[in-house]
Regions:
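Sec-dependent N-terminal signal peptides
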Residues: 3-12
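Periplasmic c-type cytochrome electron-transfer domains
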Residues: 15-305
Length: 305
């Protein structure tokens, strides 16, 4: 398991540029992805045909619904903030507690979750088989046709296409030093120098390790969500979560697993206190926030409204 509890400031400041990378190209099956897109947008996969994957993960809203908790079938509310599906292919595990190892495993979860889409494997398969388009396409693409596993596979293949390329920061990393303003570059320097990059690194600036919320100052979650503990039942895993990606972070409020922080600036303050043990000055906050906004990339044009 990937845990990091020690923060070593100087090495991250000196070598920080080598810890973050521009988004790479991803190979995917176009036929499966096209089918998966239809399924992702289709509410008939839920028990009462009212909720689609896109209702909680709006593709025009950078893969979230901007709500504290999403609404499932019958108006039920979920227990954690819905993470973005954009760039999820680069996460080392899926969900806040890391219970799904792959996109395919993750795709199965909401379909069967009683609060979210509330269906069964047989129910999902039956809904898909009723649709003539689906029936024909599954026979073309999969030897065994419509199965629950194949449905999840096609949705996962579509999610591989949800990558937000061409952010200002990616252009900067690829050699265009004029892509960031002086303030944004200073914000990146603070991001490295203060230790943010110790957890938010790699191609996704996060999503590649677990971390405790409350490293330097204890964080008491009013929602009593126990994070990784819910999967492992190990006491040491309480309040440990997958570190979220910071890509498109300005667009994905509210923040954290409990959705309790509404502004990006407040999220930076909280992280400084509980994870780094630092209190940022007003100027530092402004610069770090300016840098984080350079991580906003471009959605596929058809999802821009």
């Amino acid at each position: 398991m990937r845990y990091i509890f020690l923060i070593c400031f100087l090495p991250f400041f000196v070598f920080g540029d080598q810890l973050v990378y521009p988004l790479p190209k991803v190979v995917y099956n176009k036929q499966k992805a096209a089918l998966g897109e239809r399924l992702f947008l289709d509410p008939s996969l839920s028990k009462d045909s009212t909720v689609s994957c896109a209702d909680c993960h709006s593709l025009s809203r950078y893969g979230v619904d901007n709500k504290e908790f999403s609404t499932g079938i019958g108006g039920a509310k979920g227990g954690v903030n819905s993470p973005t599906v954009y760039n999820a292919v680069f996460n080392f595990v899926q969900f806040w507690d890391g219970r799904a190892k792959t996109l395919k495993d993750q795709a199965k979860g909401p379909l069967l979750n009683k609060v979210e889409m509330g269906n069964t494997e047989k129910g999902v398969v039956a809904a898909v088989e009723k649709n003539r388009y689906y029936a024909v396409e599954f026979k073309k693409i999969y030897k065994d046709g419509v199965t629950f596993d194949n449905i999840a596979d096609s949705i996962a293949e579509f999610e591989k296409t949800l990558i937000t390329y061409n952010s200002k920061f990616d252009r900067y990393l690829m050699g265009d030093k004029s892509a960031l303003t002086k303030t944004e570059q200073e914000g990146f320097g603070l991001f490295k120098g203060k230790g943010c990059i110790s957890c938010h690194n790699g191609v996704n600036l996060g999503g590649n390790m677990f971390q405790k919320l409350g490293v330097t100052v204890e964080y008491k979650d009013p929602k009593s969500n126990l994070g990784r503990y819910d999967v492992t039942k190990n006491e040491e895993d309480k309040y440990i979560y997958k570190v979220p990606s910071l890509r498109n972070v300005e667009m994905t409020a509210p923040y954290f697993h409990n959705g309790l922080v509404g502004s990006l600036k407040d999220a930076i303050v909280l992280m400084g206190e509980h994870q780094l043990g630092v209190e940022f000055t007003k100027k530092e906050l402004e610069k770090i926030e300016a840098f984080l906004k350079t991580l906003t990339g471009e959605r596929p044009p058809r999802f821009v409204k």
